[in-house]
Design a protein with these regions (language model features):
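A charged, aromatic-enriched C-terminal amphipathic alpha-helix characteristic of glycosyltransferases
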Residues: 149-155, 162-190
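Nucleotide-sugar-dependent
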Residues: 31, 81-88, 95-117, 123-135
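Conserved donor-binding loops in enzymes that form glycosidic bonds
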Residues: 23-28, 58, 78-79, 175
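Conserved donor-binding/catalytic core segment of Leloir-type glycosyltransferases
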Residues: 13-31, 37-40, 181
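Carbohydrate-associated surface elements
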Residues: 1-2
Length: 191
């Protein structure tokens, strides 16, 4: 789960001149970026011109080489304190989450997923559709789950968010807080 205190005083710096998709954390070679790159290439020129893709954290050089050839604005931000990373999340239009393309990846639940949920921004997940991370996103009522290679669906999702056709997030993020989850676990243990 996420720590509610991390979001208490976080700054929001929305930049209306850009449509911001952010990835927060390490992007190593196991994280399949090709689906996202193909989706960005399929976006309309209007969206591509307003698009800012922001990576906060370490990015594998091979992925940077692919991304830098996209012809859109890309920003690489090295390691920042967690509070600053939270501000980047809150200042984004879409948060990109990629599950590593490795065997037995359906059970991967990253801490980043819960922080993204707490940020209450649209999440675009690329990974196993039947995996645990996808199930959490689906339980929140979000539509942003895409299998590796589903670039057309991902591109369509990005366009819908850009055009405000997908906007309202009506889930209660507290169900994914560390405090709530710890309370639930303690009740199970006590019973």
């Amino acid at each position: 789960g996420y720590d509610e205190d991390d979001f208490a005083d976080a700054e929001v710096n929305k930049d209306n001149s850009n449509f911001v998709i952010s990835y927060i954390g390490v992007l190593s070679p196991q994280y399949e970026i090709d689906t996202f790159i193909a989706a960005v290439k399929q976006l309309s020129k209007t969206i591509q011109q307003k698009l800012l893709i922001r990576f906060v954290g370490q990015v594998y050089q091979g992925s940077k080489d692919k991304l830098d050839n996209l012809g859109v604005k890309i920003e690489y931000v090295d390691y920042v304190p967690h509070k600053t990373a939270v501000s980047y999340m809150l200042s984004s239009d879409i948060l990109l989450l990629i599950i590593p393309n490795i065997s037995d990846n359906k059970g991967i639940l990253t801490g980043k997923l819960f922080a993204y949920i707490a940020a209450k921004q649209q999440i675009a997940l690329v990974g196993p559709v039947g995996g645990d991370a996808a199930n959490v996103i689906n339980k929140c009522g979000m539509d942003g789950v895409f299998a590796y290679g589903e670039s057309f669906s991902l591109s369509d999702f990005i366009e819908k968010v850009y055009n405000n056709e997908i906007c309202c997030l009506n889930y209660n993020s507290k169900y994914y807080s560390r405090k709530f989850l710890t309370q639930q676990l303690s009740e199970i243990i006590v019973d």
